[in-house]
Amino acid sequence: MALGTLFLALAAGLSTASPPNILLIFADDLGYGDLGSYGHPSSTTPNLDQLAEGGLRFTDFYVPVSLCTPSRAALLTGRLPVRSGMYPGVLGPSSQGGLPLEEVTLAEVLAARGYLTGMAGKWHLGVGPEGAFLPPHQGFHRFLGIPYSHDQGPCQNLTCFPPDIPCKGGCDQGLVPIPLLANLTVEAQPPWLPGLEARYVSFSRDLMADAQRQGRPFFLYYASHHTHYPQFSGQSFTKRSGRGPFGDSLMELDGAVGALMTTVGDLGLLEETLVIFTADNGPELMRMSNGGCSGLLRCGKGTTFEGGVREPALVYWPGHITPGVTHELASSLDLLPTLAALTGAPLPNVTLDGVDISPLLLGTGKSPRKSVFFYPPYPDEIHGVFAVRNGKYKAHFFTQGSAHSDTTSDPACHAANRLTAHEPPLLYDLSQDPGENYNVLESIEGVSPEALQALKHIQLLKAQYDAAMTFGPSQIAKGEDPALQICCQPSCTPHPVCCHCPGSQS
């Protein structure tokens, strides 16, 4: 048997004999430069750093859109959010739309393979009438979490750090307090934020233990609210990080990762559990020291520059994945087809934008991904993709700043930088210039034939991609209905402030 055939046979046997448990940890508004393993000098992230040391650390891992709702849709479906209608912007508490039920999620793929599926944390893919778009209707057997960002409701009277440090800012006004849901039932409204991460960890432990008792593999999607603004943490992490509220929030996220890994170890499942860590988009730089760090990369959340779309990513599976660092291209879109391959689950009968990178993970080959296409948070079919990376080169056909990346020293990041077309496109060699500082088409040494050929190829890729892409009907354009806001006391008055059932401080 040829060596390549042997590797394929081993991978096939792995996917059918004993599919691994899957722990997918998704951080919120975390920058490329925020973790210790990615070079931050003062972050306290020992558990994540341990995953990086014992697993595969990606240097070139991307999300297709640098905003919460579309990025989460891409992660769970393996499809660009313009296909599923998850644009423009984000869904809110009153949104009538959501992730269409005909979209096939990673949870549905794995549930059909026999997995016990659960989600803890931030959903942000719609609520809908009677909770029609919530996780229990999208393939998750169990759900404990908040259906959108925790700043999408008034927070001026909430405690973010114990014993009584209030949340910074006022968050969104005129809405119901944020609800914590257990499946489709309101558990607390609003929940005690300093105790929220601990509740998620407890929920996750129970799910993993129950799956083992049932003799089933588990899929846990742990979508932490950390490090989204306003930051919060429990007593064990408050004022402990040395990096202020953001650092405390990040430290609690790291602590949760440690607690989850301890549970996996206590259950004797370390070599049977594939752990993936990444984040939805780059840092919200407008928050300054409370907004995270994109490291060497340009701009952050809301932009198609590297700081908005390149994310830390770690994959850990002892005995199966050799520790190291990879510079291969990969995307959050790739997780669904990759996990389907590793578990022996059939792919959904839809157009997927992700590719199977299991050969890269298992050390039997390279990533088949050669290009990454980036849409802005507010896309349209006229402009199509704003930027394309192919190999080491990235071209920006359009750029646009974002309020999320205000306050930086780079005006290209700011909301005041309106939509700008570039002809010829801006072209960067990311192998030498990951910060996108030097347009190679303006090099004082002249433009190399290689760069010109790369530009020509990327221009062709964009033209072909835009021509082939069909935007799905926008779910966000369906508008809002305040009656859809979740309320623990639906007929109470005065609405929405009467929707107040805080529960216990635990």
Curated annotation (Swiss-Prot):
Keywords: Calcium, Disulfide bond, Endoplasmic reticulum, Glycoprotein, Hydrolase, Lipid metabolism, Lysosome, Metal-binding, Signal. Its EC number is 3.1.6.8. The active site is at 68 (nucleophile), 124. The modification 3-oxoalanine (Cys) is found at residue 68. Glycans are attached at residues 157, 183, 349. Substrate binds at residues 122, 149, 228, 301. Binds 1 Ca(2+) ion per subunit. Belongs to the sulfatase family. This is Arylsulfatase A. It comes from Mus musculus (Mouse).
